């Protein structure tokens, strides 16, 4: 009983990106070839797939900027922290403000903080 090309394709399609990378490496070693071009194409596809799959984002305050008071107010409003905690968080930048939030919430938080003068990154 032999395996058909379609069965192999289905098996590879069901694998995770890391499993596919390991499979390619093993095939390169087994057959003594280099799949550098194929890896680059697969890597680009994997990066796009990973970006689509990401549903939780972290909002990082990189710097408070010139208007620290406005940034502290924005942080308090977004996080529910007290004045002292928000001030400490802003002064300890770079610091994580919120972790595991949706893309829409992360972008809204980033926008409000940037309007207050902060430098913000969404990861």
Curated annotation (Swiss-Prot):
Which keywords appear in this protein's UniProt record, sorted alphabetically?
Ribonucleoprotein, Ribosomal protein
Oligomer status and interactors? Homodimer. Part of the ribosomal stalk of the 50S ribosomal subunit. Forms a multimeric L10(L12)X complex, where L10 forms an elongated spine to which 2 to 4 L12 dimers bind in a sequential fashion. Binds GTP-bound translation factors.
Q: Which family does it belong to?
A: Belongs to the bacterial ribosomal protein bL12 family.
In Pfam terms, one family for this protein is: Ribosomal_L12_N
One GO term of the biological process aspect:
translation
Q: Which domain of life is it from?
A: Bacteria
Q: Which SUPFAM superfamilies match?
A: ClpS-like, Ribosomal protein L7/12, oligomerisation (N-terminal) domain
GO CC annotation terms, alphabetical: cytosolic large ribosomal subunit
Question: This protein is called what?
Answer: Large ribosomal subunit protein bL12
The question of whether Ribosomal protein is a record keyword is answered with: yes
Which function does this protein serve? Forms part of the ribosomal stalk which helps the ribosome interact with GTP-bound translation factors. Is thus essential for accurate translation.
**Does the keyword field hold Nucleotidyltransferase?**
no
């Amino acid at each position: 009983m032999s395996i058909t090309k379609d069965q192999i394709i289905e098996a590879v399609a069901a694998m995770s990106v890391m499993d596919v990378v390991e499979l390619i490496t093993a095939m390169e070693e087994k057959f003594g070839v280099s799949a550098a071009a194929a890896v680059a194409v697969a890597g680009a596809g994997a990066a796009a797939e990973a970006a689509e799959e990401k549903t939780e984002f972290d909002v990082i305050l990189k710097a408070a900027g010139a208007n620290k008071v406005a940034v502290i107010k924005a942080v308090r409003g977004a996080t529910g922290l007290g004045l002292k905690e928000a001030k400490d968080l802003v002064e300890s930048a770079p610091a994580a403000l919120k972790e595991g939030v949706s893309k829409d919430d992360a972008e809204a938080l980033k926008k409000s903080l940037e309007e207050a003068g902060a430098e913000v990154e969404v990861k």
